[in-house]
Amino acid sequence: MNWILLLLALVMIACILCNKLTSKIGMPVLLAFLAVGMLCGVDGPLHIRFDNYALTETLCTVALIFIIFYGGFGIKWRAAKPVAGKAVLLSTLGVFLTAAAMGVFCRFALHTGWLEGMLMGAVLGSTDAASVFSILRSKKLDLKYGTASLLEVESGSNDPVAYLITTIVLAMMTTEISAGRMLYMIFAQIVYGVGIGAVLAVCTVFFLRRFRFETSGFDTVFMAAIAILSYVLPVLIGGNGYLSAYIAGIILGNQKIPNKKNQVHFFDGVTGFMQLMVFFLLGLLCTPSKLGSVILPALAIAVVLTFVARPLVVGVLLTPFRAKLPQQLLV
């Protein structure tokens, strides 16, 4: 146990030092966390053999709850409102079209099945919320045309949509699913997710304005519990927990609540640690020696997604809004 704690402390320190280095050379720090995980993995100097995917899924789910909740909490609705329509369009229809485009590519170029290709597109079609929030807030970029708000709203809301598409495709791959059942899944995911997130946030604001915590710091613990509740409650009845957490975060972040500055400092630290944990675990699970057989298809998917599918979808959806070409290219 002591050796595990020692390793944990050293990994955290190494990641923090990497943060200092990457900020100087302009590289996303999350890539450094991924690299540290790979160095600690089975093919790295430490030869740590870790393949507990169930534990990784649980830890990453918890991490995403806080990352997405705080992503919503940090959005200024006044700045985001003018671009909300475009952001929602990108995060819904945009993710679906990207997944469909990648499905076609995987089917004809890589000779996968239609559903397997669609699954690949659904998993990869959304922008990574942790990366977007990390880059925009650490670099404090002064982007024109409300692009920063557009990226934040889209990246926070497209993960729930990608999760929904992935769930539907997996259900189609593993069981016979009727059209009615599919429509109900979509309805439940969206309505329960949005509804429970909004109601929980409103009740939380009402409670915080009337209840006084006797011990300093318990308000932040309470808010962490609300973040977890915002995910768990809709999931229990078939709703989208990530969408609920995001909606709850947006509403709470734009309300006047006591000790809000303390909440920001608390979640800054928590989400920083969660991002470190997610990408370190992904690196730890990676086995570079086994990448040889899949590296070319993976690179082909990455290139087509980055330089063909995503730009085409963004262009189709944003051109009617008369979005400037530089904004479309950045998005």
Placement of each model-derived feature along the sequence:
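Transmembrane helical cores of multi-pass secondary ion antiporters/exchangers
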Residues: M1-V331
